[in-house]
Curated annotation (Swiss-Prot):
The keyword Glycoprotein does not apply. Its main location: cytoplasm. Its EC number is 5.5.1.6. It comes from Humulus lupulus (European hop). This is Chalcone isomerase-like protein 1. Coiled coil: none annotated.
Amino acid sequence: MATALNSKNASSNTAVHIEPKTGIAFPVKLDDGKSLNSVGLRKKSLLGMGIKVFGFGLYADNEKLKNLLKLKIGKSPAKPTEEMYQLVIDGDIGLTHKIVIAYSGLKMNMFKKAFSEALGESIMKLNGGRKNEELANKVLGPASDQIKLATGSEMEISKLPGYVLETKVHGELASRVESELLCRAYFGIYLGEITMECYKESKEMFGQSMLSLF
């Protein structure tokens, strides 16, 4: 990331970056080598209050990303461009979206419903306006509604080689779906040209991280 990442996790001495609005710590590197390129927060308005639902970190295989940017873009632009973001969304590059729950009142069935609705809308935008609820429900649909989502609960949604979207909840595999459309739709939610207001800051941070790779 373009910002300094010098915090340490006292228990493991692992370098972390703190998402400032939630205080959630995200490791600078994952075990598979992906690097943290941005952090962010999902907020939702409830009864006039802004609820902090979850903090998140967006990770990428920065070596492959660097090679792709230099091949397709060449020289570093003055600021991040939509073309750069689209390369990340469309490319067969390893990505991970790490979610850490911040709201203690969240239930798994509530999360799954909101998750699938947002993903379904993103799929529809890429699919000529056609819905594909079956595809959207394949990601978290297999996860049991009985799973507890306490504050600090973690999920990881990763784009693996060959456009495979893998989802883990509490470190356990929930689904693995091979679909280029699904991969593009999922990461387009956070990096696409039209993103929710609460995701714009993390998108810009990801863009600045990409600029540092040139």
